[in-house]
């Protein structure tokens, strides 16, 4: 709502949230070389809770990240900008690791939450990439990896084109509104 009042539109298309399943936590700890324990989970697993914010344009990603960073009810621990620095696979998204206070009856526990912010096109690519790699258990053939990176480049071009188109639409709308105001002023001046 605050963003909508400031910018005349809501950049958020949708939000997804999830809590990592216990068996996924155990697998991840083993992959990292740690025993399954509460202490290891708290110390080494940063994405037990996750929120994905999917927005329209790449410019929205950075505006939303800035707004999230200014929230006084959470603390930003780290940021990974996979948009400016994509993963080798072609994955692009903006990740923020934050701590959020959880109020219990007798104490407050700061809990890590991973926030991912991406465009609809990035989300589409990431969803399909995840399914493909899951089928190959992380060992996709080289040609599939190359094709995925190529598709990631196409997604980037699409995002850039849509952002450019949106900016052109906003400029045309502003010019149209300015012309209407001039016409109204000219009419009012003639009537005097």
Language-model features: where?
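Short, small-residue-biased leader/transition segments that mark boundaries at the very start
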Residues: 2-3
């Amino acid at each position: 709502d605050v963003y909508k009042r400031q910018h005349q539109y809501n950049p958020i298309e949708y939000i997804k949230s999830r809590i990592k399943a216990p068996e996924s936590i155990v697998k991840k700890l083993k992959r990292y070389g740690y025993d399954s324990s509460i202490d290891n989970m708290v110390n080494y697993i940063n994405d037990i809770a996750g929120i994905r914010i999917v927005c329209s344009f790449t410019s929205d990603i950075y505006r939303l990240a800035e707004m999230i960073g200014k929230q006084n009810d959470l603390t930003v621990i780290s940021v990974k900008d996979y948009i400016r620095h994509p993963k080798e696979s072609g994955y692009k998204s903006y990740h923020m690791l934050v701590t959020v206070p959880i109020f219990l009856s007798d104490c407050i526990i700061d809990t890590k939450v991973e926030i991912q912010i991406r465009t609809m096109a990035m989300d589409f690519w990431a969803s399909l990439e995840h399914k493909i790699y899951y089928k190959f258990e992380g060992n996709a053939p080289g040609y599939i990896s190359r094709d995925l990176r190529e598709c990631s480049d196409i997604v980037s071009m699409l995002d850039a084109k849509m952002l450019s188109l949106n900016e052109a639409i906003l400029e045309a709308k502003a010019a149209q509104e300015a012309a209407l105001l001039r016409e109204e002023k000219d009419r009012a001046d003639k009537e005097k």
